[in-house]
Amino acid sequence: QIRGGSPFLGYYRREGSVESKVKDGWFYTGDAVTKTDRGELVFLERLSDLKRLRSGDTFPPQFVETRLRFSPFIKDIMTVGDEGRDFVAALINIDMAVLSRWAEDKRIGFSTFTDLSQRPEIAVLIRQEIARVNRFLPPHARVQRFANFPKELDPDEGELTRSRKLRREFLEERYGALIQGLYDGSRE
């Protein structure tokens, strides 16, 4: 929320839309932000997109995912966590092009995406990338467990949109057993 004169005139062709967002002189943006030690505001997520864990703590899934996508080894990621779960977990889609070169340089043998994605050396590397990002997150928002997708995500199989956005509900259904394994301790 911000306070002051209206920061904008309104939404195009939606009269009265600003008034519904202003309460007692405060404009409610609908954004979740945090303040750094230097006083800077960092956008986390739309409030409507925050997820709540069993503890009642909320975490910003897209913020966590975006930070992890900065890793050259991670092509895509889907965080998992809801009111029925105690912690944040993640499913990782490795970057085959980058990791295949890395594996060849390290003389790690593999023949397929599945073979490479499930190698212990790859798990160690991804765990290090997650630990790097976790240092900057509050404890409840840190990724505690992860698994690598056993295959590259594919728009033709309905796992991604044509613009390569995750189809979360579809992925949660398709990989439900893998997700459950992260929470019952049978994975990672």
Please annotate each region the language model reported:
Residues 100-119:
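A solvent-exposed, charged loop/short amphipathic helix patch at secondary-structure junctions
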Residues 1-53:
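Conserved ATP-binding/catalytic segment of the ANL
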Residues 30-32, 37, 71-98:
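C-terminal boundary motif of the adenylate-forming
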Residues 9-16, 97-105:
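Cytochrome P450 core scaffold surrounding the K-helix E-X-X-R motif
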Residues 51, 76-78, 102, 123, ...:
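Conserved C-terminal "lid"/linker of ANL adenylate-forming enzymes
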Residues 63-70:
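Short amphipathic alpha-helix segments
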Residues 54-59:
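Short, surface-exposed ligand-recognition loops at beta-strand->loop->(often short) alpha-helix junctions
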